[in-house]
Amino acid sequence: AYWFHGTRTSADNTFDSGLLPLNQTESLVMDMLVNLAPDVVVKERLQAWNFHAGVPDTLFRTRTRNEMHWGPYGHLVQEVHFHARKLWQHDYLRLPELVEDVCNAYQKKYGQDLTEHYLKVLKPCIVCFRADIEYEKGAFEAALSYAYTSVRELPPDSGAVFGIDRHGISVCLDEIVNVEFTKLHELDG
């Protein structure tokens, strides 16, 4: 099956190393945020956090230390990413969780919200990859739900939400079908 991993990243990210689980992306995410920091002060402060579990945020530490959160993850229905909030999903095209955690920690510690800056410099991206379906009935139900709403020109409903968890195993470069930077985001507000 084809799966769709949503993120927001630097425009030059080619995913040459594949899609990595969170425990392997921690330093890459921090390097990206440091390199794209709005000024020297922010850059130095973020650099000081750039070591394993160095971000002073409980969620960041949980996500990078606990393999239950590592993923990588993907949705079976690509359009779910464009209606994430309506479907009670995290909006990865807006900000990935680790980036959000860093912004939250920075605001708490230094009183400056970096969210708008990183929304401007990072670009929404969907990585399509191939992987086996582990639960065929769930995938079939999601596909039927999506077909039902799609032919009626409606956005997907919660029945179309079905995903894959790679359980800490990377998506290799040869499993990646396409990397698409998109301007489409949150079609339903």
Regions found by a protein language model. Give the residues of each.
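Conserved NAD+-utilizing ADP-ribose enzyme module
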Residues: A1, S10-D16, L20-L22, S27-D31, ...
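Histidine-centered active-site/metal-ligand motif
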Residues: H5
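Low-complexity, serine/threonine/proline-enriched polar segments
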Residues: N23-P72, L76-R85
